[in-house]
Amino acid sequence: MENKKLTAANGRPIADNQNSQTAGPRGPIMLQDPWLIEKLAHFDREVIPERRMHAKGSGAYGTFTVTHDITKYTRAAIFSQVGKQTECFVRFSTVAGERGAADAERDIRGFAMKFYTEEGNWDLVGNNTPVFFLRDPLKFPDLNHAVKRDPRNNMRSANNNWDFWTLLPEALHQVTITMSPRGIPASYRHMHGFGSHTYSFLNAENKRIWVKFHLKTMQGIKNLTDQEAEAIIAKDRESHQRDLYESIERGDFPKWKFQIQLMTEEEADNYRINPFDLTKVWPHKDFPLQDVGILELNRNPENYFAEVEQSAFNPMNIVEGIGFSPDKMLQGRLFSYGDAQRYRLGVNSEQIPVNKPRCPFHAFHRDGAMRVDGNYGSAKGYEPNSYGEWQDSPEKKEPPLKVHGDVFNYNEREYDDDYYSQPGDLFRLMPADEQQLLFENTARAMGDAELFIKQRHVRNCYKADPAYGTGVAQALGIDLEEALKE
């Protein structure tokens, strides 16, 4: 039988795990009790900083399989041939809530993917919506503060939340999605995923094309009403996590169809909307979806903390054949995500097994807290050197990216104030019953927000479509004419 006797961290057997050392049966605890001190000290440090956003999450391993040839667009090895399979890890999450938040709350859902390719890890850090509230990362900390707890009373504040959202009219597209029936997915298995940002593909000829990534659930879309969600939360705050775990355990593996949209650099220069604006989508009629592969989740983690809580996703992690774009929000995340992981997990978080590349890597980074991989041994710690170590690969350079204009703090609202056309298009695509749910969900979510904030939201909705603003005003029980007065 395997030896499962209790030991201290250094391997020393523990003689007594029931009673502390004391001076006499009623006497004080002895500081010399090594197991008591070790056990308490480790307990005091068990909790690492939680993610500032996406704190409550669930994860699973799986496989990405290529079903369609896209090698004319990208030289990324993950897409190199039809039938190729790549191991991956996916973490789903709610966004605004803390670790103890309920899974079935009305919120955006995170959909973060890590592909363990032979060229390195590719992290596609997405959500279940194709857009976001913001197009400038300078306002991301403000969004966080608005949707988190109020600094005075430590309670969530509809007033703070909606005050911020309604003062940024470009947020209306995301707000409309969040307040729609899709604002509460029935489970992680029954929602779509999106890379959301614009990225770039680079092919064998080093030609660039812009790309957006989509994952369409093959289980079908299923959502919850507010009332259904409230009933579930009353009984099970881990409903989405339980559904994902149990479905994989019984062999009912969830799948998503992996698709892309493509836009040439010339098309981007001349298109009527800014293709790098995260508050807008690329219309499918102009840039149709193209099938690429299938993502299947088929293995649960063995330990939640080690594999889900310590997983770290960073959009900076790309592979050859995939690149970035002028998307401002993407560029902000390129810094912020890695910086947050270094704070949360340490500078060597890539050595944690769930984050570690499956291919050889030689990153030149040395030392730092919790360095456990040999630290590159006696290899030289500088470059250039005379010993052929740490050489770069100039043949891997991307083509030059054209930029336009002078460096300045440009106010994008001065040359792009089209905040309402796409939310209006989305509203008009909804059948009447979904529009009514949108009105009612919005009214409940606004709760006790001040009247002038509700009126401001009605004005924003009315600009997207008069029926949208009218319906929200009626659901809120406020006078439409008064609300429309600027």
UniProtKB/Swiss-Prot annotation:
<feature type="active site">
    <location>
        <position position="127"/>
    </location>
</feature>
<dbReference type="Pfam" id="PF06628">
    <property type="entry name" value="Catalase-rel"/>
</dbReference>
<keyword id="KW-0560">Oxidoreductase</keyword>
<protein>
    <recommendedName>
        <fullName>Catalase</fullName>
        <ecNumber>1.11.1.6</ecNumber>
    </recommendedName>
</protein>
<keyword id="KW-0376">Hydrogen peroxide</keyword>
<dbReference type="Pfam" id="PF00199">
    <property type="entry name" value="Catalase"/>
</dbReference>
<dbReference type="GO" id="GO:0020037">
    <property type="term" value="F:heme binding"/>
</dbReference>
<dbReference type="InterPro" id="IPR010582">
    <property type="entry name" value="Catalase_immune_responsive"/>
</dbReference>
<dbReference type="GO" id="GO:0005737">
    <property type="term" value="C:cytoplasm"/>
</dbReference>
<comment type="function">
    <text>Decomposes hydrogen peroxide into water and oxygen; serves to protect cells from the toxic effects of hydrogen peroxide. May be involved in aerotolerance of B.fragilis.</text>
</comment>
<dbReference type="GO" id="GO:0042744">
    <property type="term" value="P:hydrogen peroxide catabolic process"/>
</dbReference>
<keyword id="KW-0479">Metal-binding</keyword>
<keyword id="KW-0575">Peroxidase</keyword>
<dbReference type="InterPro" id="IPR024711">
    <property type="entry name" value="Catalase_clade1/3"/>
</dbReference>
<feature type="region of interest" description="Disordered">
    <location>
        <begin position="1"/>
        <end position="28"/>
    </location>
</feature>
<dbReference type="InterPro" id="IPR002226">
    <property type="entry name" value="Catalase_haem_BS"/>
</dbReference>
<dbReference type="InterPro" id="IPR040333">
    <property type="entry name" value="Catalase_3"/>
</dbReference>
<dbReference type="InterPro" id="IPR018028">
    <property type="entry name" value="Catalase"/>
</dbReference>
<dbReference type="InterPro" id="IPR024708">
    <property type="entry name" value="Catalase_AS"/>
</dbReference>
<comment type="similarity">
    <text>Belongs to the catalase family.</text>
</comment>
<keyword id="KW-0349">Heme</keyword>
<dbReference type="GO" id="GO:0004096">
    <property type="term" value="F:catalase activity"/>
</dbReference>
<dbReference type="InterPro" id="IPR011614">
    <property type="entry name" value="Catalase_core"/>
</dbReference>
<keyword id="KW-0408">Iron</keyword>
<dbReference type="InterPro" id="IPR020835">
    <property type="entry name" value="Catalase_sf"/>
</dbReference>
<dbReference type="GO" id="GO:0046872">
    <property type="term" value="F:metal ion binding"/>
</dbReference>
<feature type="binding site" description="axial binding residue">
    <location>
        <position position="337"/>
    </location>
    <ligand>
        <name>heme</name>
    </ligand>
</feature>
<dbReference type="GO" id="GO:0042542">
    <property type="term" value="P:response to hydrogen peroxide"/>
</dbReference>
<comment type="subunit">
    <text>Homodimer.</text>
</comment>
<feature type="active site">
    <location>
        <position position="54"/>
    </location>
</feature>
